[in-house]
Structures are given as structure tokens and as C-alpha cells.
Regions:
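Short alpha-helix immediately C-terminal to the canonical SAM-binding loop
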Residues: 174, 280, 302
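A short, acidic, amphipathic alpha-helical segment used as a generic capping/interface helix at domain edges
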Residues: 251-267
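Non-catalytic positions within long, well-ordered alpha-helices that form the structural scaffold/packing
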Residues: 76, 182, 263-266
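FabD-like malonyl-/acyl-CoA
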Residues: 1-140, 192, 269-299
């Protein structure tokens, strides 16, 4: 049976998040590779006691990249089969490209650190915000954003599952949208603890700089189909892949469509490759035919391989 691998983005990090892979030297070695490139000990960070440090986007992005690549390498090391397709949520798209051998891991580490710095500097602290709107239709959320903008930016940026949409933009506009969403019958409107309003048009200046940086990065033809966030399609051409990564910074993550497209293609089963179980849970909520596993420790990897 064909299956897809999903790679998580920011928000799935936690202290001790790789404890389930203590026996896999390859996992720590992968973190050591990334640490050597950045001149920082990422392994010590995730095994320390300061959750705030790993929650800073400049650290979270390389940590989550290393985690996803490490788990994928551990899976292959013990004889796991190649997935039919891969996709990553936001930052996870870079991990997916590494897994598909389109992007060198060392290049990806540098790129995601730069991506984080560009995102952080595009919008000063306190100016932007993000919030999750639960219990409304996608189109309702889009409409409320348009009505609440009042000359500022507020956009629907993550379509995570039916009834779960994340918005981002100027803090005041996000606040107005949250209030209007509650009035419109949203079950909840929750501010997210992030410093950067990802995937909205406030990220365009960062995207322009990312495009410059990508000019010097080699992208090879993917060996596995990579479904891109911005378009919900796969590309073989390096130029198109780079363009998709640039547009991803200021375009919505179309996760609901991604899962549905794979199910329509006969790929209903998926495994989340990295810490956390967010994407595995979303798959089941998006499509009743979808089945999601989470490879959160060595035992889960073994169980998944035995079942496939």
C-alpha cells in the first residue's frame, strides 16, 4: 500500500523531543551536523531546560528541520520503504525536499536559519500576530478577514483542517478578526504564542530576500514527489521549486487540500516524520479515508515498517 510522509513545522518542538530515539546514534549525528554548520549546539538546546530558547524562530526552524531529517534517516536505516509522496507543513516543506534528495541537508540548515531571520526582521516584535479560528467555514474566515482589515493586513494563512483556520497579519487587525469571528459563531478564537505573522503578505519583503539567497542554492530533481504548500502540486523543475518556496512565505499553507489530493490519488495512509502528532491527527480530521501514524520514537518506526 502506498503511503506519504508528512514533516511538521514550527509548534511541534518541545524539550526532550528526541528522547524516543536515544538508541539511534544517527539521530544525534544529524543534529551534530546542523550544529556544526550553525556554530550552536542544537542537541543541547532541545535537551536543556529553556523552552523559550527552542521557541525562538531562529532556533525552532533549524531544530525542526534536523528533527525531521533525523527521524527519516533513522527510518531508512532500519529498512523503511520510500514513501510515494512527501509534504511538509510550512517549514516542513524544506525537510520534505531534503528527504526527496532535492535539497542538500547542509544547504537546508543554512536556508531555514536565514528564512527565520528574514521572517523575524520583516515585522518588528509586537507588530504582527497570529490566531486560530475554530468552528467556521474557510470562506467565512476569509470574508471576516476582508471586513476586519480596515486598511491593515489580516489573512487566512493555514487551512489545517475543516473548521480549523489560522489567521495572521497586523496585531490590531488580527484582534478585530478574532472578535468578529466569535460574533459570527466561531467555537474559539485563540491567539497563538508566536512573534512572526507567517504566510501573510507582511512577509513579502522577506520573500524577496529569500529569492536572492535561493539563486545560489542547488536544487536537484526530487526523487520522491513533493507536494508544495502554495500550489498543492509537485514540481520537477528547480526554478519552479524555488519559486514555490519563495511564494510559500506569503501564501497560505493549504494542508486540507494536500491531504485530500493525496487521498484522491490513492495515497490515504501517511506517517508524520518528526516530533509530535499534530499532522497525524489532522489527516484523520480532514478525510475519513485518511489514516495517519506518528513516528515519535523508535518503536513507532518499527511498528510502521512491520505494517508496510
Amino acid at each position: 500500500m502506498s503511503f506519504a510522509f508528512f514533516f511538521p513545522g514550527q509548534g511541534s518542538q518541545s524539550l526532550g523531543m528526541m528522547n524516543g530515539f536515544a538508541e539511534h546514534a544517527l539521530v544525534k549525528n544529524t543534529f551534530d551536523e546542523a550544529s556544526a554548520i550553525l556554530g550552536q549546539d542544537l542537541w543541547a538546546m532541545i535537551n536543556g531546560s529553556d523552552a523559550e530558547i527552542i521557541g525562538q524562530t531562529v532556533n525552532t526552524q533549524p531544530i525542526m528541520l534536523a528533527a525531521g531529517v533525523a527521524v527519516y534517516r533513522a527510518y531508512l536505516e532500519v529498512g523503511g520503504k520510500t514513501p510515494a509522496a512527501v509534504a511538509g507543513h510550512s517549514l516542513g516543506e524544506y525537510t520534505a525536499l531534503v528527504a526527496a534528495e532535492a535539497l542538500d541537508f547542509a544547504d537546508a540548515v543554512k536556508l531555514v536559519r536565514l528564512r527565520a531571520e528574514l521572517m523575524q526582521s520583516a515585522v518588528p516584535q509586537g507588530v504582527g500576530a497570529m490566531a486560530a479560528i475554530l468552528g467556521l467555514e474557510d470562506e467565512q474566515v476569509r470574508q471576516i478577514c476582508a471586513e476586519s482589515a480596515q486598511g491593515e493586513v489580516v489573512e487566512a494563512v493555514n487551512f489545517n483542517s475543516p473548521g480549523q483556520v489560522v489567521i495572521a497579519g497586523n496585531a490590531a487587525a488580527v484582534g478585530r478578526t478574532m472578535a468578529a469571528a466569535k460574533e459570527a459563531g466561531a467555537k474559539r478564537a485563540l491567539p497563538l504564542p508566536v512573534s512572526v505573522p507567517s504566510h501573510c503578505s507582511l512577509m513579502k519583503p522577506a520573500a524577496d530576500k529569500l529569492a536572492e539567497a535561493l539563486k545560489t542554492v542547488e536544487i536537484k530533481q526530487p526523487q520522491i514527489r513533493v507536494i508544495h504548500n502554495a500550489d498543492v502540486v509537485a514540481y520537477d523543475d528547480a526554478g519552479k521549486i524555488k519559486d514555490a518556496l519563495v511564494r510559500q512565505l506569503y501564501s497560505p499553507v493549504r494542508w486540507t487540500e494536500t491531504v485530500n489530493a493525496l487521498v484522491s490519488d490513492g495515497i490515504a495512509e501517511s506517517a508524520e516524520c518528526g516530533p509530535g502528532k499534530v499532522l497525524a491527527g489532522l489527516a484523520k480530521r480532514i478525510n475519513k479515508a485518511a489514516a495517519g501514524s506518528a513516528l515519535t520514537d523508535a518503536g513507532q518506526i518499527t511498528a510502521f515498517i512491520e505494517a508496510h
